[in-house]
Amino acid sequence: MNVPHPHRPSLWLNARLATMDPAHGAPYGALEGHALLLRDGHIEAVLPQAEADAAAFDGEVFDLQGRWVTPGFVDCHTHLVYGGSRAAEWEKRLTGVPYQQIAAEGGGIVSTVRATRWLDEEELALASLPRLKALMAEGVTTVEIKSGYGLTLADELKQLAAARRLQASLPVEVATTLLAAHAVPPEYAGDADGYVDLVVESILPVAARAGLAEAVDAFCESVGFSPAQTRRVFEAARAHGLKVKGHVEQLSNLHGAELVAEFGGLSADHIEYLDDAGVAALKRAGTVAVLLPGAFYFLRETQKPPVDKLRAAGVPMAVSTDLNPGTSPFASIRLAMNQACVLFGLTPEEALAGVTRHAAQALGRGATHGRLAAGCVADLLVWDIAHPAELAYSVGVPLLKQRVFRGAAQHID
């Protein structure tokens, strides 16, 4: 299969499309025997094969020979820009050493903060590059990257700048999120309110003015920040024109999802302890529920998110890797899909929607990403599969034939 020139229009024939567009009604939004017309980095048309006049087309023509095509994957929740490793800490925990002892010895999130602060922007981007490339190799074309391991003005900005540097060097779209309210740094031990002052009065305004973040996140949890502190962060985000999202209801129910919904948040993430009021709030606000099965698995949790209630209420469910060094060190979007099915009870179709249409919605990109539809960006994946369910069924099997970003393709073979 040839690789199209990135600046020329292209016509992709003989495709089986998993459009993930509910307008088509069929499972996966499937269209058999169709063609895609790509121009200027966007999908210009999705048309039946019989209407695709290859002979008269003024660009490049490619025969997909009946292969399945999906939208490019969207990984809507990652912490992939960081320094260091927590493998030794994980090994200790497996042998029975309590987390409190590890933290007292300088481990835990503080060790990642220390390692991240030690690296400069270029070094941080280089350290994170293999993780991003691993996601791209499985079909990720858009990825969210959070800060949250700097916890000072300079280091939070450095993380966001490193994420932007990665976007500039690779064919991938990066959505940056400020997560300064991730943990209380050592300098503010015992003074969470004082640290929140720093976030809302300094870190967040500077990041907003610099254009380094498009959204603001906060870890609303008993071991993170209280609902009142989270509200302060969200109010500051709104004042600076930034969208909000939240790490909520992961370990307990502090009604953080309702707070996210109150601010019209893009997404409520983790949500293992989400209750009926939280489900209703997400539905009313149009907020996406982001499921993170990797962290659930890695931490050996037992409380599952209320998938049946979310499904019944019609709350869109996204699926993401939560790639991070402490609780989900997995750079595999297809593993997350498999885990969402096996651990949380999603169907393969729901899992695929979770890394395409709904994940795009969780990043405020629902109108332009995550579907094969006219007007959407020309980010698409060509697969060697017999059925779309295979994408969530197997892990580690290289199924991706071609990754197309804004109309330009790369061979995966």
Curated annotation (Swiss-Prot):
The keyword Nucleotidyltransferase does not apply. This is Imidazolonepropionase. Its cofactor is Zn(2+); Fe(3+). Disulfide bonds: none annotated. Coiled coil: none annotated. Pathway: Amino-acid degradation; L-histidine degradation into L-glutamate; N-formimidoyl-L-glutamate from L-histidine: step 3/3. It comes from the Bacteria. GO terms for cellular component: cytoplasm. It is found in: Cytoplasm. Binds 1 zinc or iron ion per subunit. InterPro entries: Amidohydro-rel, HutI, Metal-dep_hydrolase_composite, Metal_Hydrolase. The gene is hutI. Its EC number is 3.5.2.7. 4-imidazolone-5-propanoate binds at R86, Y149, H182, Q250, T327.
